[in-house]
Curated annotation (Swiss-Prot):
This is NH(3)-dependent NAD(+) synthetase. Keywords: ATP-binding, Ligase, Magnesium, Metal-binding, NAD, Nucleotide-binding. Catalyzes the ATP-dependent amidation of deamido-NAD to form NAD. Uses ammonia as a nitrogen source. Homodimer. GO terms for cellular component: cytoplasm. It comes from Escherichia coli O1:K1 / APEC. Deamido-NAD(+) binds at R140, K173, D180, H260, K261. Its EC number is 6.3.1.5. GO terms for molecular function: ATP binding; glutaminase activity; metal ion binding; NAD+ synthase (glutamine-hydrolyzing) activity; NAD+ synthase activity. Belongs to the NAD synthetase family. Pathway: Cofactor biosynthesis; NAD(+) biosynthesis; NAD(+) from deamido-NAD(+) (ammonia route): step 1/1. HAMAP family: NadE_ammonia_dep. It is an enzyme of class 6 (ligase). NCBIfam families: nadE (TIGR00552), PRK00768.1 (NF001979).
Length: 275
C-alpha cells in the first residue's frame, strides 16, 4: 500500500460522494451522539464566514431542528459564536453565513482584549510572542471561549476539521483542532462545496479564498499560499488521482510532520514518531 493509499484510508476520504447522502450522514451522526448522551443540550460552533464553519453550522442547526421535532425536547439548541479579533475584515460574509444558517442563538465574543492581556502577561515574564505564535494564541482563545459557553449550556464544541485540512495538519493544536465532535471529517474541500451547493448556500461563502487569517503581519493570507499547494491538488490526492511529484511530496511532508496533531498526547506506548 502506498503512502497515498494509507492516508486516504486513515482519513476516510472517498473519490466521489453523493451530496444529499453525506448531508444526511452528518446530520444523523450529530443526532445519534446527542441521543446517546441526553445530558448534552447544545452544540456550540464558532462561525467565521468561511466555507467550513458555514457548512458545519448549517448541519448542526438542521440536526437540532430535527431532534426537537422528533423528541419534543425544546431545551436543545445550536449556538453560533462570533469570535472576531477586533474588527473582522470579512464581517459581511460572517453576517451572510449567520443568515444562511439561522442559528437558534448567536453570541459574539471579541477575543482581542483577552489575547492582548495574555500577550502582555507573557511579555512581563520575559516572553515576546512572534506574530505566528500570536496567531495560535488567537485560535486557542477562540476555542477557550467556545468551551466556556459549552460548559455553561451543557454543550459540546463542534469542529470543522475535514480531510483536506487534516492531511496537512492545517489547524492550531488545542485551538481549532481541539474540539469534541467533527461532522465534516472524511470530506475534502470540493466535496464540502458540493454539500453547501446542495443546501442552497450563497456561492460567495464557499467560492472565496480560504484563509485562517491569524497573522497580523500577513492579514488574510490564503491557505494555499501558506501550504504551498492548492486545495485542488490536495483534493485530487485524497481522491486517489495522480498529482505532480512535487505536489505529492509537499502534501506527504505536511502529513508526516503534523502526525502529532492528529493524535492524543504522546505516551511511552506510542512509536509513530520513531519511524
Amino acid at each position: 500500500m502506498t503512502l497515498q493509499q494509507q492516508i486516504i484510508k486513515v482519513l476516510g476520504a472517498k473519490p466521489q460522494i453523493n451530496a444529499e447522502e453525506e448531508i444526511r450522514r452528518s446530520i444523523d451522526f450529530l443526532k445519534s451522539y446527542l441521543q446517546t448522551y441526553p445530558f448534552i443540550k447544545s452544540l456550540v460552533l464558532g462561525i467565521s464566514g468561511g466555507q467550513d464553519s458555514t457548512l458545519a453550522g448549517k448541519l448542526c442547526q438542521m440536526a437540532i431542528n430535527e431532534l426537537r421535532q422528533e423528541t419534543g425536547n425544546e431545551s436543545l439548541q445550536f449556538i453560533a459564536v462570533r469570535l472576531p479579533y477586533g474588527v473582522q475584515a470579512d464581517e459581511q460574509d460572517c453576517q451572510d453565513a449567520i443568515a444562511f444558517i439561522q442559528p437558534d442563538r448567536v453570541l459574539t465574543v471579541n477575543i482581542k482584549g483577552a489575547v492582548l492581556a495574555s500577550e502582555q502577561a507573557l511579555r512581563e515574564a520575559g516572553i515576546e510572542l512572534s506574530d505566528f505564535v500570536r496567531g495560535n494564541e488567537k485560535a486557542r482563545e477562540r476555542m477557550k471561549a467556545q468551551y466556556s459557553i459549552a460548559g455553561m449550556t451543557s454543550g459540546v464544541v463542534v469542529g470543522t476539521d475535514h480531510a483536506a485540512e487534516a492531511i496537512t495538519g492545517f489547524f492550531t493544536k488545542y485551538g481549532d483542532g481541539g474540539t469534541d465532535i467533527n461532522p465534516l471529517y472524511r470530506l475534502n474541500k470540493r466535496q464540502g462545496k458540493q454539500l453547501l451547493a446542495a443546501l442552497g448556500c450563497p456561492e460567495h461563502l464557499y467560492k472565496k479564498a480560504p484563509t485562517a487569517d491569524l497573522e497580523d503581519d500577513r492579514p488574510s493570507l490564503p491557505d494555499e499560499v501558506a501550504l504551498g499547494v492548492t486545495y485542488d491538488n490536495i483534493d485530487d490526492y485524497l481522491e486517489g488521482k495522480n498529482v505532480p511529484e512535487q505536489v505529492a511530496r509537499t502534501i506527504e511532508n505536511w502529513y508526516l510532520k503534523t502526525e502529532h496533531k492528529r493524535r492524543p498526547p504522546i505516551t511511552v506506548f506510542d512509536d509513530f514518531w520513531k519511524k
